[in-house]
């Protein structure tokens, strides 16, 4: 990571985030996806952040939980996320781990395009963010999400309606709160 403003305890967390985003591998080497991000960030940052968000949903248990459990138009704050997640993760993570993870996620929403631009955590009031539908999903991000979903589920064929089933985990609808209209429009 070279020269940076991260504290000693932040560096391992940031490396973990880069691995979850599939930007670096387990040996901290830039991946092919990471190089794609470097090559395209200047020209299409919104696409790159959408692809990063998709990867993090699949690779981070807490972010995956967020995508699958916080609904469109649902307001939240860190304390509420931690409380809800603790009920789900109490046997796997300590309360402090969950609190710190959601504190970091709130920072991602506040200081990266994942919040306002991708609509995952838009300012709602002084203390709350809200999750909205991300209506400007690119064809590339849509295709990538479908690929990740098919790969994760061993699927060879996908139907739009399957993404709206109650038991559907991850996928474009959960990742970006897509309405059926937006999803179908993106497929045309």
What are these regions (language model features)?
Residues 1-188:
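Donor-sugar nucleotide-binding helix/loop cap in glycosyltransferases
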């Amino acid at each position: 990571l070279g020269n940076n403003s991260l504290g000693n305890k932040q560096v391992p967390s940031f490396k973990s985030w880069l691995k979850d985003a599939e930007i670096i591998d387990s040996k901290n080497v830039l991946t092919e996806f990471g190089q794609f991000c470097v090559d395209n960030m200047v020209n299409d940052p919104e696409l790159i952040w959408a692809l990063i968000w998709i990867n993090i949903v699949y690779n981070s248990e807490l972010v995956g939980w967020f995508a699958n459990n916080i609904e469109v138009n649902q307001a939240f704050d860190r304390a509420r996320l931690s409380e809800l997640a603790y009920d789900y993760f109490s046997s796997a993570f300590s309360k402090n781990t969950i609190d710190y993870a959601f504190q970091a996620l709130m920072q991602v929403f506040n200081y990266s395009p994942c919040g306002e631009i991708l609509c995952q955590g838009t300012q709602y009031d002084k203390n709350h963010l809200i999750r909205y539908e991300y209506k400007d999903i690119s064809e590339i991000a849509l295709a990538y999400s479908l690929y990740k979903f098919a790969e994760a589920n061993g699927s060879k064929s996908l139907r739009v309606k399957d993404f709206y089933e109650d038991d559907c985990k991850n996928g474009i609808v959960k990742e970006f709160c897509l309405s059926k209209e937006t999803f179908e429009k993106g497929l045309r």
